[in-house]
Amino acid sequence: DHIIGAEPETFEGPSWNAFSDRFIGALDRGLKKQMESTLGDELDREVIPRRSLGLMLERRRAHFLVDMRLMMRRLAHYMAVTVGHRMEWQRLMTRTRCLDTSLKEIFTEGVETPDGSRFGGKGFRSTWQEGVVAVATALNRQPDAPRDARPGQGYDGDLVAPMIRDIGLGLAMGDTPLDVMAANLGKVGSNQNGGWDDAGGRDLHVGAWHVGVLPPTAPLPIASATMTGLAFAAWRQSLERFHVACIGEGASSSGEFWEAMNLAGARGLPITYILQNNQIALDTPPAKQSGVEVWADKANAMGFPAWTIDGSDPAAWHASTAVAREFALEGGGPTLIHVETMRGCGHAHHHDDLYLGNPSGTPAGYVDRDLLDYWAAKDPLPTHRALLVEMGVSEADLELMEAEETAAVEEAQTALNEMEWPEPETVTKGVTSLHDADTHLDHFERYTGQSRPEANDAPLKAGETAWSYAEKGGWTYARAIQQAMADVATMHGDDCVFIGEDMEVAGAFGMNMALKNAGHTDKLIDMPLCEAVIVHAGVGAALSGMKPMVEIQFGGFAALGFNALVNNAAMLRWRWGADCPMTVRIPLGARTRSGPFHANMIESWFANDPGLIVMAPGTPQDAYDLLMEGAQLPDPVLMLEHIGLYGLRGGLTGWGMNINQKVDTQTVNDRIANGERYKVGRAEVIRGGTDLTLITWGAMVHLALQAAENLAEEGIEI
């Protein structure tokens, strides 16, 4: 094949695209011809069960052609970069460097606090890695979105999850130096305030969700996994939205990052992972993190394209992101961009001396000096500045821009110094939408050391019970939950999604059959068998405005999702005021022939976490009411379902008891329609007594009631 004919000496966009198509087409034909002429009948030979050599090579060929096409598109975007692009990058990189310098000074010197001490906050500089700003210029940005905007509610741009040191990426999306400073010090102007004005920063990391910047977390893979969940939501909601998840080579070793990439590859999600090789994690070199030849190889196992770029070249960041976005929104799926770079500073401000060494020689610093010198010579600020001068930008224009950025950061620092510190008691605000946190003083004030005198307004008289069991016509515990799931799906329509393992056939214990019978099969999504990313995906869907209902099949398996529940879902509201309307159903409990790992009773794991709402209904009526009500809350809710109560043994519990009830579905739905709370967060007296109070939940409600009836025969009323 001949692909070059009367080609122009230089290409423009249309001619380059036409040439690329001809080149890829010729390459495709050539590879096919080579396979057929060289291997012939061997192509039909089975090389692994149910897969022929021809099919194996065909898939390799398809991947190779995708790689070639993406490479040519990167060339096109790279060559389309203008001086205007480069001036914006230089300005943003200068802003980042100025801000980093100021934050380091604040950390070193501290800012005076009301008690007379000094506090410098914390922070992570991006020295030599400022080229990340160019990612944003390839995205759909809305830097002027209002402060109360959220994705789908005033902000309709792309989303980014920066690493903790990617301050420049946040600035390029629309974050401001003052917001970054306020977040680093936790002052009242911080947008990491749990949604409470003047509460100050609860998280000294940065973020600006109103312009699409997801605040990072200390367990670093959480951000990538959550962004994967947001990409999952965009896929479900048919949104024209792209997602960027940044991670370092150290954090890329984590299981949750691999789980996230695996989900993205399995579902073809619109996301790119930017994996930055910093040459060292905190203190651990890359060779002790992974055996890959290049970090881009990590995408191979997940089945999507990856490539490597030089992190000191802003145009490479821009072109790579532009191609990843183009590919994803055309339906190509995820990509991974491996960035070779180096941080020219310690992991955090306090780490500089250990990393680089103190001028005194103690400590000497442990970083390799040859490596340091190599990357110092590639510092993007001076090298890219020199390129701009070569391209005709005047020194006067560059110096004016640099003076403007320096002045803007100085102005922000002045405003920071005038900003108030938060009042300590505000730290308790906004733990969930139902309640604030208690202080130790609150606990002491409630304690009197005396039994409560008998009340004349007790809801039930001694021996009187609040409910009864139905011998005929009642619902089992399982049926009540199934009906609630179907009613939630009907109520929320396309915003509702049910995710977990084995969901599309029937779900654990066949609980999804009612959804299928009610016409909601399209809302059931099978997920890879990895509980952490199932929960993270639910969090991302919730942040995107959906109403996800997550299933973890057994109580013991919730341990695999513990980080996702406790360090992600539970903290979102308290950290930065985000709604996370996600319900997580977890079957658990003994007397079910389940054994270890399945029957674990896990309420104590989560009930002590202030950001989670934990429900453990004991009756069909409570199961219906609480699941319906919990699914309306803007908080992460755990619905703990004792398997022994399901009624799997002919409608009886695991210990042979009938607990079926005639369930009233109207009352709770009326309360929901009126915006009123009903049962969630409240106790209920189910038997009146005078001698002792038993507080219990779940399956133990029935056993406690039996015990009370037995003791009543001895004259003891509970």
Please place each PLM-identified region on the residue numbering:
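Short coil/turn connectors at secondary-structure junctions
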Residues: 86-90, 119, 154-159, 176-181, ...
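Glycine-rich ThDP/TPP pyrophosphate-binding loop and its adjacent helix/strand module
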Residues: 1, 212-411, 417-418, 607-718
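Conserved acidic/glycine
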Residues: 1-133, 138, 143, 153, ...
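Cofactor-binding active-site loop characterized by glycine-rich and histidine/acidic residues
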Residues: 118-267, 285-303, 596-598, 605
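Thiamine diphosphate
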Residues: 134, 211-279, 309-327, 497, ...
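Residues forming anionic-ligand binding surfaces in small-molecule and nucleic-acid pockets
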Residues: 83, 100, 105-111, 197-210, ...
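Acidic-glycine-rich active-site phosphate/pyrophosphate-binding loop
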Residues: 189-207, 295-296, 505-518, 667-676
